[in-house]
């Protein structure tokens, strides 16, 4: 769904004849909607079965998919994107919460594979959008067909979601996250800040700092995305072999070393290889941290807090790199990401090591049930 929308952003900008700055403000409205809905969804998950919340948010998001492309003004687009982002944020929290429930019912890690499915879906949607654009199909028609098709597919899939969780404790109100949740959320912030910054600025680094051609610069994001997809599809197997703490810390260390080498060498081909390694290293950090947050009671709010902090890093990372690079240069600014990933390497073991104990604290009972419709 997200891939379908993102692929049509350039068309929408041309269609509305808006500047990059105006488009950026509209996209910030989408992010604002997500940041509002994520904590609220966490508390809804504390009271309703996760499968029910996934079903409701997924179906609502599918119905909203064509709406941004139907906007006739920047103001209309901003309002639509706020609601669109809220639905997307709610669905993301619900899906990850349900993924944690399925993972615990199976007794083995699956979160990396689930996030790998997201990566594959994004590639597929972007490829389909390119084909339909080449065929001359109006993006509004494509998004309408896609929205209806994804609604029917989601309706079928969400009837077969399996295990779900609800939290049986009473009286939870909106409250500040606990110290373990803050630690995990802080690591999510650093990891997703690095992920967003590398994704958006790796190509620009190749173009302006290594002298790569436009086609060569595009290989930076392609290699980074390829590395992430491969690592996520194999991440659960590695997790079972070496454990989540070693996988998180080793992956963060790999990204720090690879990105540091990219910045020191400053040549196109080695940099592309380095960005592939960055994708391999960073891919499983978010699934591991979300799994850890989902084991801390109260589970829905804990996961939502980690997700919100991480998403904030993903949002602020790319523009922050842009602002700082104007003053210090892009290579020096990207070097700050190396420092952030070293921090993840140092603190990752402490964050994941405490979640098993904290998931048993608080006297609240987690009910895992089969959801059938």
Label the model's feature ranges.
Residues 12-13, 44-45, 131-136, 206-207, ...:
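Interfacial helix-cap and linker-helix signal at transmembrane-aqueous boundaries
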Residues 140-159, 332-350:
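Symmetry-related core transmembrane helices of the 12-TM Major Facilitator Superfamily/SLC fold
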Residues 36-49, 133, 231-244, 325-326:
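Helix-to-loop junctions at the C-terminal end of transmembrane segments
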Residues 6-21, 200-216:
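Short amphipathic helix-loop junctions that connect adjacent transmembrane helices
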Residues 69-80, 263-273:
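Helix-loop junctions at membrane interfaces in 12-TM secondary transporters
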Residues 89-105, 283-297:
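Intracellular juxtamembrane helix-capping segments at the cytosolic ends
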Residues 242-289:
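C-terminal transmembrane helical hairpin of 12-TM major facilitator-type secondary transporters
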Residues 36-75:
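Conserved MFS/SLC helix-loop-helix module at the cytosolic interface between two early adjacent transmembrane helices
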